UniProtKB/Swiss-Prot annotation:
It catalyses: a 2,3-saturated acyl-CoA + O2 = a (2E)-enoyl-CoA + H2O2; (2S)-pristanoyl-CoA + O2 = (2E)-pristenoyl-CoA + H2O2; tetracosanoyl-CoA + O2 = (2E)-tetracosenoyl-CoA + H2O2; hexadecanoyl-CoA + O2 = (2E)-hexadecenoyl-CoA + H2O2. It is found in: Peroxisome. Gene3D superfamilies: Butyryl-CoA Dehydrogenase, subunit A, domain 2, Butyryl-CoA Dehydrogenase, subunit A, domain 3. A motif (Microbody targeting signal) lies at residues 698-700. This is Peroxisomal acyl-coenzyme A oxidase 3. Its EC number is 1.3.3.6.
Length: 700
């Protein structure tokens, strides 16, 4: 049943090749084409297919196994590919605005191919370009065509060598000179150098630079963004007063040139201030639509939320690639069996199912969340461009900030653990570089720290939740938020009094069960975090110390549990939308329940300690439910992967091609490597001077 539907839309899909995976596809309980249409929609499916086929048919994007280019050549090739992507017109603004979700789809498709390429394009067009558009005003729009045509190439320079997460402590300065109507941009010392900036190492000609804005009277108005030319657009030589360079090789994504920059009293026109959050008039007066400094800083750094939301999606892509490889491998790799003459696919083993199928469920749940939070962000940005600074929009922005700040840690950590588990689940073949797990692991790794260290970001979410726990809320007063993610807290006291009354496996087999448990868990952790904070504040008297000492067993798990609940709630609602066929609702419902129980099982100690569940049988029943769901999803796993996996060319893993010819494809890939059958170029060293034992002993 896993084959594609025979209808007019079937041209959107490629025929699934016949081979060893066909048996699993035939056992699927649903139609994979129907699920693909529900999951992505016809417009997005067509867009994806166009991107994948375009890359595959262009020799510039050809890849060979085992070819490691020198760093300089890798950077050159990545820039050439970036140019080609723009030449194909994938970043046409008018097309992307018709369906903003295509922005996310484009990033993800390029990232499935290579994150160095995706991030180079994204940092230029969607981070640098969008910041100029959203944070600037009409006088800055002249740069947009130059950005799109690559006449200028941009980057986003916020982080400094000595400061990252603490944005308010950035030390680059911009002093206003009223006599010349210029800003003087300056780095007071090397610790204030802009650092880790993507595209800045070799290619950026312009940067959005964040600096502390000082007026002639010495008053500092805080962090503002400025458009600064870094290099000459013809020669790529640094501009006067700018010291710029490359920070060097990284653990991954080395096609992207991360760099540093220092400014020695560099003068830029007053008009180069991106002035939507604050401006200086020609008369030299500073004004801002935001009276609150924190609100202004939040608006100035609004692009950070978009960056974090992009990273959620990037992490999900990496997880989808990893589970696609692991499940296809597991369905075709046969080892052992009930008799010596019979071997069965390792996917048939409950242990293998338990190791990788929860990550498949997580990929689906997080994928849906990443799409919905992205569209929420689009709504906020659209309202800001319309000049809507209402309290409702401010609260929406605050809620999205809280979701992005916990969503990035949850997604990136889930992907990082999932990639490693999938690597190990593929045994020795998973360690072979050509099968891609190493690149996935290294490319996903920075998602855990850039655009905000995960553990620091979680504090943003817990602070948001703790701010809601005021006396009116505890008294049961009405409470709501724009996205309704915290509306359940209106029943906060009542939820804390609830207990799980079931004791059998069947009681856990519906996604409503983990949802109810998570609502209780969030309320319990909110109460515990608030209690810890108040105790620490009373004993130490410092808000700073009280917050720090409330993190480990309070605020950190609170933020993660809240995020897991939000992801599960949105997935649950999506599955129960109208018009979904029974077969799709069943398989997606199993994924939803598995994701919820798998996440919830990591909080068992808290569920018992807080009294939500009791007795040995309840915990065992949850474990039995997880194993049963894995068994139920086993026959659907290959078809579920067919929905989220890219083309073979983009997936680029010999052990995970859609035809399932595991050994033929792996053997062919090994033999296609350059020099695989040649003797070592250094063979004379092996043959000459063989008697080396003890030769240098006298010199010791």
């Amino acid at each position: 049943m896993g084959s594609l539907p025979e209808e007019k839309d079937s041209a959107l899909w490629s025929d699934t090749p016949k081979g060893p995976l066909s048996a699993y596809r035939a056992r699927a309980s649903f139609n994979s084409g129907e699920l693909l249409l529900f999951w992505d929609g016809q417009d997005v499916i067509h867009f994806k297919k166009t991107i994948f086929s375009t890359l595959e048919n262009d020799p510039l994007f050809a890849r060979s196994y085992g070819a490691d280019l020198p760093l300089e050549k890798l950077r050159e090739l990545n820039f050439l590919r970036c140019k080609r992507v723009f030449e194909y017109g994938f970043f046409k603004v008018e097309e992307l605005l018709k369906n903003p979700l295509k922005i996310l789809v484009l990033i993800n498709c390029l990232g499935m191919y290579d994150w160095s390429l995706a991030n180079k394009c994204v940092l230029h067009m969607l981070v640098f370009g969008t910041t100029v558009f959203v944070s600037g005003s009409e006088k800055h729009f002249k740069y947009l065509e130059k950005i799109y045509s690559l006449e200028i190439f941009g980057c986003f320079a916020l982080t400094e060598l000595s400061h990252g997460s603490n944005t308010k402590a950035m030390r680059t300065t911009a002093h206003y000179d009223p006599d010349t109507q210029e800003f003087i941009l300056h780095s007071p010392d090397f610790e204030a150098a802009k650092f880790w900036v993507g595209n800045l190492g070799k290619t950026a000609t312009h940067a959005v630079v964040f600096a502390q804005l000082y007026m002639p009277d010495g008053q500092c108005h805080g962090l503002h963004s400025f458009l600064v030319q870094i290099r000459d657009t013809k020669t790529l030589l640094p501009m006067t007063g700018v010291m710029v360079g490359d920070i060097g090789k990284k653990l991954g994504q080395n096609g992207l040139d991360n760099g540093f920059a220092m400014f020695n009293k560099v003068r830029i026109p007053r008009q180069n201030l991106l002035d939507r959050t604050g401006n200086i008039t020609s008369e030299g007066t500073y004004n801002s639509p935001f009276k609150d400094v924190r609100q202004r800083l939040g608006a100035s750094l609004g692009s950070l939320s978009s960056g974090r939301i992009s990273i959620i999606s990037m992490s999900v892509v990496n997880l989808k690639l990893a589970v696609s490889i692991a499940i296809r491998f597991s369905a075709t790799r046969c080892q052992f069996g009930p008799t010596d003459k019979e071997e069965i696919p390792v996917l048939e083993y409950p242990l293998q199912q338990w190791r990788i199928l929860p990550y498949l469920a997580a990929a689906y749940a997080l994928d849906h969340f990443s799409k919905t939070i992205f569209m929420d962000l689009i709504e906020v940005q659209s309202a800001r461009l319309r000049g809507d600074h209402s309290d409702q929009q401010a609260e929406l922005g605050r809620e999205i900030h809280a979701l992005a700040s916990a969503g990035k840690p949850l997604a990136s950590w889930t992907a990082q653990r999932g990639i490693q588990e999938c690597r190990e689940a593929c045994g020795g073949h998973g360690y072979l570089a050509m099968n891609r797990f190493g690149d996935l692991r290294n490319d996903n790794d920075p998602n855990c720290t850039y655009e905000g260290d995960n553990n620091v970001l979680l504090q943003q979410t817990s602070n948001y939740l703790l701010s809601l726990l005021e006396p009116p809320l505890q008294d049961g007063a009405h409470f709501t938020s724009p996205l309704k993610t915290v509306d359940f807290l209106e029943a906060y006291p009542g939820i804390l009094g609830q207990k799980f009354l079931g004791s059998s496996k069947a009681d856990w087999m519906d996604s409503a069960a983990p949802l109810a448990a998570y609502r209780w868990l969030v309320c319990y952790l909110l109460q515990e975090s608030h209690r810890r904070y108040c105790q620490e504040k009373k004993s130490r008297g410092s808000d700073f110390e009280a917050r720090n000492n409330s993190q480990v067993y309070g605020c950190r798990p609170l933020a993660l549990a809240f995020m897991e609940l939000t992801v599960m709630q949105r997935f649950h609602e999506h599955i129960h939308s109208s018009g979904l066929s029974p077969s799709l609702r069943t398989v997606l419902g199993r994924l939803s329940t598995l994701y919820g129980l798998w996440c919830l099982s990591q909080h068992m100690a808290l569920l018992y300690r807080g009294g939500y569940i009791s007795g040995e049988q309840t915990g065992r029943a949850m474990e039995d439910a997880i194993l049963t769901l894995c068994e139920q999803l086993k026959d659907d796993a290959v078809a579920l992967v067919d929905v989220i996996a890219p083309s073979d060319f983009v997936l680029n893993s010999p052990i995970a091609k859609a035809d399932g010819e595991l050994y033929k494809n792996l053997w062919a890939a090994v033999l296609q490597q350059n020099g695989v059958l040649e003797r070592a170029a250094w063979w004379p060293e092996f043959s000459a001077n063989k008697s080396v034992a003890d030769r240098l002993k006298s010199q010791l």
